[in-house]
Structure formats: structure tokens, C-alpha cells
């Protein structure tokens, strides 16, 4: 049996822990909240973050002790909120076994540095690229927790190590594919959240299919241009991690980014939408980072820029869309 540790027991971390357990691994969840640790360890239930799953697999346990969590780990999965990753992972730097692979479920761009999560993880843990993997795809945590059929992509510069991580999370209902395009996977996972915010806002404001389709396709063009400028393979953006994740995130009330945007479209302020949000909408802190990244790479980011105005200036959905359209005729 492979020993797998999941750092972070939120909804997605716990749902993915269940996938790993269903795949036959020994799974240890690490959390800082004592009530979550006790719930998973003693009752096989995460009533705080994933109450819909009444009984988690018996080969899942939990601890709040960092050293205990990673001591015997073959694979370590990072499922921490993106903006807190650097601080949280610093506590594990001297504890992680030298042979362990580290895989990230995180989707976001670090606001303070503009760096992708692969860069943050490898810098913080002093980890070589061939021991890091990113996992991303159309993976809404509630559906994965309910064991609905789904697929994802595992990226690592070392394809053998990508395969090891993929094998550890392969079940009858969860199918991972592998690639070496870490940059592409990271860019897809991060940038689609900004598009989901915009689509959700348009839906919340009462706009229909044409508007949503326009935002999604322009969002895809924007994130593809950014990704390619950063060194990604353009094909990645038209697969599961790109178009696939965009479809899932922009079309479901299960998506926290879509729901956050919908609440903005209904007239809630950013502060009000944050209060009623169930979990972290990573697109909110990522938006400004995407605009800054576009400036750095000399790539226009009109959608991210308009959503930045929404979040920072409080402009309305109609104003956001008017700004997105502009007045000049351009090529698609």
C-alpha cells in the first residue's frame, strides 16, 4: 500500500482523500482544526467541510501533528488555500521525506509575488521539479465526493512520477491523465476562476446564454494567450484542464467562484458576497495577480482587468460588460 498524506481537510482535500482511499492507499489527512481532526479520525466524518459524506473510508485517518502527518508519506497532496500556501508549507520544509513526491490541488496565483503554485511549492519546500506534480481538471468537490464519474490531469516534468501520482488516485469513477506541461496545467487552473467569476456575475445579473458564451470563449482566449506567453503548450488549454475545467466551473452553482460572481451580479458587495460564500473563491485574490501577470508578459487581459474593477472599484455587471466590449473593431 502507498502512504499518502493530504495537507488541508477542506471540501476538495477531503473529497480527494476519499478518492485516494478508494484507490487502496493508506490516507492521512492533516488539518489545523481539532474538530476536523477528531471527526475524521474518530468518526470517519468531516462534518465541518464535507458533511454530505456521512462515512469516509476506514483507511482514512487524520492528525493535527505536522511531523506525524508526513513521516512515512510516499506522496504528499497539498490542498491548502492558495494565498496561504507559502506560510503553511514553510512549517513542513524540514519534515518531508527526501523521496516523497509532492502534488498540488491548489489553483491560484500568489497575489504578493505573481507566482504560480508550482513555483510557490518548489521554492518553499526547496523541492526539485521532478518531485513536484500539479493536479487539475473539471473536479467539483461535491460531485467527486458523491463518486460521480470524472477525470483530471496530473502534470510533472518527470512522466514516470506523474504516472505514480496518477496511479495513486485511479478508481472506477476517477480517471487521471498525465502530461509534462506543468506550466499549462497551473495556468489553466488559476486563470479559469477569473472567467467563472465573470460568468457567474452575468448570470446573477440576469443575462443569458449568449453573454455567458461570449465571456467563456473570450476568457479561454485570454488564459491561453497568457499561458503560451509563460511557456505552456497551447494544446493543454483545449483539454480537460482548460476547456473541461472552464465548462464545469462556469456552469455550476457548485463552483464557489461562479456562486461568488452570481452574488455580485445580484447586487451584493464584495464584502457581503464573501460573508455568504461557502469556502474560498480563489478567483477573487487571483484576479489582480492575473492583471499584473499580463502586464509582466505584455499580454492584454481585458476580462481580468474588468473583473479587477468590479472587485476593487465596485462597478456593476453592465459596466463590466461595456468595458469588456470596448468600441474598436478587432480580430477575434
Task: Please give the residue ranges for each predicted region.
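NAD(P)-dependent Rossmann-like dehydrogenase/reductase catalytic/cofactor-binding core
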Residues: 199-203, 228-238, 242, 246-332
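NAD(P)+-binding Rossmann beta1-loop-alpha1 motif at the extreme N-terminus of oxidoreductases
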Residues: 1-53, 60-61, 91
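Rossmann-like NAD(P)(H) cofactor-binding subdomain of soluble oxidoreductases
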Residues: 56, 62-71, 75-149, 165-167
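Electropositive phosphate-/nucleotide-binding environments in soluble metabolic enzymes
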Residues: 10, 14, 30, 34, ...
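General beta-strand structural signal in soluble alpha/beta enzymes
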Residues: 104, 130-136, 176-180, 239, ...
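Internal alpha-helical scaffold of NAD(P)-dependent oxidoreductase catalytic cores
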Residues: 84, 95, 120, 124-131, ...
Amino acid at each position: 500500500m502507498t502512504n499518502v498524506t493530504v495537507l488541508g481537510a477542506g471540501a476538495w482535500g477531503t473529497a480527494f482523500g476519499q478518492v485516494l482511499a478508494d484507490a487502496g492507499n493508506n490516507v492521512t489527512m492533516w488539518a489545523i482544526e481539532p474538530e476536523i481532526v477528531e471527526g475524521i479520525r474518530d468518526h470517519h466524518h468531516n462534518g465541518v467541510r464535507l458533511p454530505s459524506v456521512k462515512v469516509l473510508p476506514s483507511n482514512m485517518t487524520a492528525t493535527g501533528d505536522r511531523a506525524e502527518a508526513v513521516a512515512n508519506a510516499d506522496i504528499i497532496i497539498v490542498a491548502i488555500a492558495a494565498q496561504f500556501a507559502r506560510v503553511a508549507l514553510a512549517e513542513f520544509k524540514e519534515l518531508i521525506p527526501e523521496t516523497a513526491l509532492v502534488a498540488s490541488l491548489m489553483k491560484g496565483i500568489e497575489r504578493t509575488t505573481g507566482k504560480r503554485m508550482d513555483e510557490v511549492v518548489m521554492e518553499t519546500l526547496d523541492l526539485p521539479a521532478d518531485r513536484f506534480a500539479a493536479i487539475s481538471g473539471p473536479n467539483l468537490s461535491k460531485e467527486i465526493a458523491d463518486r460521480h464519474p470524472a477525470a483530471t490531469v496530473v502534470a510533472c516534468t518527470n512522466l514516470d512520477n506523474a504516472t505514480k501520482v496518477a496511479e495513486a488516485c485511479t478508481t472506477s469513477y476517477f480517471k487521471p491523465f498525465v502530461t509534462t506541461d506543468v506550466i499549462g496545467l497551473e495556468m489553466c487552473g488559476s486563470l479559469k476562476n477569473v472567467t467563472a467569476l465573470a460568468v457567474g456575475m452575468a448570470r446573477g445579473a440576469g443575462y443569458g446564454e449568449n453573454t455567458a458564451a461570449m465571456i467563456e470563449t473570450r476568457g479561454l482566449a485570454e488564459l491561453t494567450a497568457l499561458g503560451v506567453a509563460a511557456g505552456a503548450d497551447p494544446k493543454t488549454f483545449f483539454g480537460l484542464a482548460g476547456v473541461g475545467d472552464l465548462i464545469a466551473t462556469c456552469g455550476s452553482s457548485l463552483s464557489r467562484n461562479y456562486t461568488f460572481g452570481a452574488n455580485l451580479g445580484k447586487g451584493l458587495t464584495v464584502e457581503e458576497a464573501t460573508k455568504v460564500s461557502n469556502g474560498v473563491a480563489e478567483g477573487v485574490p487571483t484576479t489582480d495577480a492575473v492583471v499584473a501577470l499580463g502586464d509582466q508578459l505584455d499580454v492584454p487581459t481585458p476580462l481580468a482587468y474588468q473583473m479587477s474593477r468590479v472587485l476593487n472599484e465596485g462597478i456593476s455587471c453592465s459596466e463590466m460588460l461595456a468595458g469588456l466590449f470596448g468600441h474598436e473593431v478587432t480580430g477575434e
